[in-house]
């Protein structure tokens, strides 16, 4: 297999994921690499003050919820998975199955740009395992191990 390094815009992301505003958590894919040695993807989530979640979390000191950072990571793994195996059919969904060892290092707020780095580790019985690291300005804000499953609906 040859090495691929590519980027994806929002329309290409929307072709791969069923999520839409306000729950689409990936704005662009800066690059991904699929080779025999590694399968990785770097995605971007721009955190805007206009995010609906900031109306209640928290109005005086907006904090982007950790669970949404994890959702952004999970969406990045879905994009990576579908770039590895091809675009999903209309009756396929990619489910976030589990998360292990999630750690939050610092809060994320309006104006931050989340850089989401995910790596495919292995697949067994239709369940894929990934690692994920989210950073802001080079500083780690969240790490986790994620498992996802592609299923017919």
From Swiss-Prot:
Keywords in alphabetical order: Cytoplasm, Lipid A biosynthesis, Lipid biosynthesis, Lipid metabolism, Lyase
Active-site residue numbers: 57
What EC number(s) are associated with this protein in UniProt?
4.2.1.59
Statement: the UniProt record of this protein carries the keyword DNA-binding = no
Q: What is its main location?
A: cytoplasm
Per UniProt, subcellular location reads as: Cytoplasm
Q: What is this protein called?
A: 3-hydroxyacyl-[acyl-carrier-protein] dehydratase FabZ
**Organism encoding this protein:** Aeromonas hydrophila subsp. hydrophila (strain ATCC 7966 / DSM 30187 / BCRC 13018 / CCUG 14551 / JCM 1027 / KCTC 2358 / NCIMB 9240 / NCTC 8049)
Gene that specifies this protein = fabZ
